[in-house]
């Protein structure tokens, strides 16, 4: 099978490269992890400088929380305003590639007009029909998450791969080469029920689904680079009985290390320094 040599923005990613770290910057007050929220100019500058000093390879900025269990949907205008303001500040602060976390075409367009390198679509291009037109025009790097508008039943590994393949077909139709694409298994976004349209409904235990995926990352990669985001996620809280996301650092680091050892190529995290150090040590002794 073909093994793709990929770049996410300007950074080479994949099995022949180090595990990369993507730092999370949220401009949405609704976000589930309050420590990641930066709204004012100075807080954004400070957060970006800190993540760069700690070793982040990318900055991922979001303007709307898509956590399935929260009622946090905002208007496109609000999301766009947050993203545009943050991107301009980040660009003046760092040369790191910027990823914009959005599934809305109008928001993606504004970000790409500003020169953003990467679009991170939690719905794998399946939410907004206009997204394909936008990405075809600007040809950004893409992070495509596993997602379905229909309820997913049966073998979760097989179904996740099928969802990836559908998103890859859609990207191909928009003339995006595979060498500009990274896949994300959407940990935390497969649920029995939720409060928005950005999650995939399943009829089985969502914690078991997430754990199954994390145990079998290599089997779902499709020879593509894989990004995994487990930082402070709900499955950690469920297992450790930690309701407050701020109490999930140890669990997050354990999960992130295992992801890296199991084949993840990029770790998206709220805890850049701790994650980078933990993965560095794990790789040295593995």
Identify the residue ranges that each predicted region occupies.
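Active-site-adjacent loop and "lid" segments of alpha/beta metabolic enzymes
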Residues: 4-8, 31-50, 66-85, 89, ...
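N-terminal carbohydrate-binding accessory modules
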Residues: 1-17
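Flexible, glycine/charged-enriched surface loops at secondary-structure junctions
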Residues: 174-179
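Structural preference for beta-strand elements that scaffold enzyme active sites
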Residues: 20-24, 57-60, 97-99, 117-118, ...
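Short polar catalytic/cofactor-binding loops
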Residues: 26-30
